Amino acid sequence: MNYPFRRILIDFILGHSDAKLAQRLVLSLYENYPLENFYAMMNLVGSHDEVRIMTILGEAQINEFMPDTEIADYQLPLEQYKLAMQRLKLLATWQMTFPGVPSIYYGDEVGMQGYKDPHNRGSFIWGNEDKKLLEWYKQIIAVRNANPALRTGSFKILQAEDDIFIYSRVINQGIDVFGQPAENGIFIVIFNRSKSEKYELTLEVPEISVGIMEDVLTSCQYSVSFGQVNLIVEPLSVIILQDVTPQYQKKAGILMHPTSLPSAYGQGTVGRAAYEFIDFLEKAGQSLWQILPLNIPDNVGSPYQSVSAFAGNVNLLDFEELITSQL
């Protein structure tokens, strides 16, 4: 059970530590665990041994002289509950996009509250579930399940400053961090823990994306220009950017000089054999062509030299074709 992970996240979200300290602590975890362990850690934010995560994130205060009956019945005021829910959305998203195995303590996904044992182990609140919070969990779980890069992709912290924490999850060239075949995917996860301040960010992403990135939570798209993407991160919000730049399929073609075509005279010509070869390429589904001029287009227009590569080359003439064509 990855309690250090839990402590790092809660301290950062509550403002007990800044992003720089959170970065150092996350990297300490990353460096001290073997890769296989780091990617298999049980990443939790709620537990049967701790105060309910909603109660913590709502900053509920407990008085040591408070009667146990009041502790048992305590519920966050509405504004504190709303704050706790927004914060929990951030933590849950962090769980689902971070290396490791996310663990959800029953009831956290529907907003259950409670102080320490036994108040954190109450019956499930059937009929009183927070449906909006539950839908958020369903959404981010679906995002994780649909994208291998969020499970076995590489992990790199891109920025950690003040209220902002950003990392990437990437699978390139069809191979994940364990050297296993996996679907390519590029993601950038951006957190703003501030309760009031929005941030205008310019992210340097030259090695991550060269085209278009899309927030998988809102479908809002961002263009990458000169290796940078500009965006605004609202208070208590998260953005999950996915690279959606169109991927061009690899294609093959044939680059060949006409003289390389077979001929009874030992050298190919621009004649019947060339026409038949072009017909063959078309029937074979070839779609890449290189067209070279047979006359001089201009002083510097040839793809090979300052004068046409073919113009005036009588060796390319097919005399049988000339006779057949009565030329």
Residue ranges of each PLM-predicted region?
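Carbohydrate-binding surface patches
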Residues: 159-206
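C-terminal beta-strand-rich structural cap/linker in extracellular carbohydrate-active enzymes
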Residues: 224-250
